[in-house]
Design a protein with these regions (language model features):
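Bacterial N-terminal signal peptides
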Residues: 4-16
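Flexible, low-complexity junctional segments that flank or bridge functional domains
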Residues: 18-177
Length: 177
């Protein structure tokens, strides 16, 4: 029971990924909508600022952060692969190409599924509670994991921390009653 609750707690923010089923694909009319929005921004926006590299960079950062705010799902190699679009989202949108967000989502979904499998296996093995370890739980400024080994270690500590929080909470509740 505890393992299921813990897995759910750690991956709850990712549930929509599993519920969606097949990988969503951009519909043909999305490109036309993107082109119209790009045109309207430059013509009708109060500041009359069209899409440019600065806006593209901000959109890129916002998208990556919205998918992985604590830098635990994407690998450094994923971010490096996405980097080529940092200053090119504006150009793609102007051309009606909306494939980049779908590619980011596809990679994110793969990473979530991988983390789900990792956590499931980890919970089946249990934890060594006699080790002196530390865990950085606010990772918004931390580097992206270099590889799956680093990511696995990060997640092992993360799940162990969640487990300890639950155990200690239960013990405090029992002591208070």
């Amino acid at each position: 029971f505890c393992g299921r609750v813990l897995a759910f707690a750690c991956l709850a923010c990712s549930c929509p990924v599993f519920a969606a089923g097949a990988q969503p694909l951009p519909q043909p009319h999305y490109g036309e909508i993107a082109k119209k929005v790009a045109k309207l921004l430059s013509e009708k926006h109060l500041l009359q600022v069209g899409l440019n590299d600065d806006i593209s960079a901000k959109a890129w950062t916002n998208m990556i952060v919205s998918f992985d705010f604590d830098r635990s799902y994407f690998l450094r190699s994923d971010i490096e692969a996405f980097e080529s679009m940092r200053l090119n989202i504006d150009d793609a949108v102007k051309k009606g190409d909306v494939s980049f967000p779908y590619e980011v989502y596809r990679v994110f979904r793969e990473r979530v599924e991988d983390r789900y499998q990792f956590v499931t296996n980890l919970l089946g093995r249990g934890f060594a509670l006699d080790q002196d370890e530390s865990f950085i739980w606010k990772r918004k400024d931390a580097p992206w994991p270099n590889d799956r080994g680093e990511q696995d270690e990060l997640w092992r500590k993360r799940i162990k921390n969640e487990y300890l929080v639950q155990v200690i909470g239960r013990e405090l509740d029992m002591a208070a009653s």
